Amino acid sequence: MDLSLPLRLASASPRRAEILTQHGILFSRVPNLLYDETLSEGLPLRSGVRDLAYRKAVASAAGVSGLVLSADTLVVLDNHILGKPKSLDDAAAMLTALSGRVHEVMTAFCLWDTRSRSGVARSAVTKVHFRKLASRDILDYIHCFHVLDKAGAYGIQDILPYSQASRDFVIPKNALISHIEGSYWNVMGLPIALLLPVLKKYTRSKMKPGFQIV
């Protein structure tokens, strides 16, 4: 995609970088300069994660030119946020909690134009169905994959490589996940189906001033 302005990814996530690369989007990285990443009080979780992505983009745009892209992902079970595990024992406890259950993955992004100081924020929700897991399944997974840097202690790309992701993909029968409702890329860390139209629209005409959040 040929953008009229350089795209700056304000995220250290290797998964988000992979998604952009897989979809032919050129970018460079800038540091995320938002140091307080707590969700704003009083907002529903989906609104809260959009607000957080917005705050990340605005903070990270300091001294930067072009388009700043930020994102944040929440793994939510029974309205409780599962963050990144602090230890392998913590990871095992998270996967045990997810076993046989359905949880939601909410990812929001904000694309911020540093020239007009305006931006667009979008979010998506994917429902993830976990199989009933035996203790051996959990132990095998946490010792075979890097789980400490992933919210909820799992990565969908470990279960189904992104090169195979499509509408009709088949998840292996022995995988942790039985099926998903919604976007694979959203679970991986960036709802690319929502981002692409925003980028394409931006290349055709300048965004109107004012922050849009829907």
What are these model-derived regions, one by one?
Residues 1-67, 80-81, 133-136, 143, ...:
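N-terminal polybasic phosphate/anion-binding patch
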Residues 63, 98-105, 151:
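Short arginine-rich
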Residues 121-206, 213:
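Active-site oxyanion/phosphate-handling segment shared across diverse enzymes
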Residues 48, 73-103, 130-136:
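Active-site-adjacent loop/tail segments of enzyme domains
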Residues 20, 53, 72, 91, ...:
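Residue-level signal for inorganic ion chemistry
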Residues 73-76, 105-112, 155:
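Short beta-strand scaffold segments in enzyme catalytic cores
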Residues 92-96, 108-128:
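Anionic-ligand binding region
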Residues 105, 111-115, 131-134, 144:
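Conserved phosphate- and dinucleotide-binding cores of soluble alpha/beta proteins
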